[in-house]
Amino acid sequence: MNVIDDALPQDIFNQLKDIVLDSPWKLCTNVSGLKEEKNCYFHHTYYHTRQWRTPQYDQIKSIIRGQLDEYLRMNCLVRVKANLYPRTECVYHHQDHVDYTTPNKGAILYLNTNDGYTVVDGYPIESIANRLLLFDPQVLHHSTTCTNQQYRLNINVNYT
């Protein structure tokens, strides 16, 4: 596991955040397969199953394959997905999961600072804007909600 603060130049980070916030969002009424009343979030999948699935693919691709590849050193993208978790009264932990059963690598870029976090193998990583978390997504991990911002926003990248 590796944490990199200020992963992107500020202007590129701001551009990426604007693109993500402008994306069409889908409501998902369960997180990690668990369906509960307070267990919902919004997501937008930019890339999955070997194809770009968004009108913003040129911009997202140039940042992921360009700026972030300094850290990721990708051979092949598996998935690029943004998650938006609405604020809750208390920080709510989602269910532990693994992203894929096939070997891959994972990265989470946090797009805003809040009191939510990602827990990887029991270790919490704070959500700080422009922080990049590199980790093994086959290790149990989970997300949380936040209480001190309107939402918690990040981009997940799975790759080989």
What do the PLM-derived regions correspond to, one by one?
Residues M1-N75:
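Non-heme Fe(II)/2-oxoglutarate
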Residues D69-E89:
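A short glycine-rich, His/Asp/Glu-containing loop-to-beta-strand
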Residues L84-P86, L111, Y159:
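Short beta-strand segments enriched in hydrophobic/aromatic residues
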Residues R87, I125-H142:
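Conserved metal-binding segment of the jelly-roll/cupin
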Residues C90-Q95, T102-N104, Y110-I128:
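A short beta-strand-loop-beta hairpin characteristic of the jelly-roll/cupin
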Residues Q95-D96, L140-N148:
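Short beta-strand His + acidic residue motifs that chelate non-heme Fe in jelly-roll/DSBH
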Residues A107-I108, Q149-T160:
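A short hydrophobic beta-strand segment most commonly corresponding to one strand
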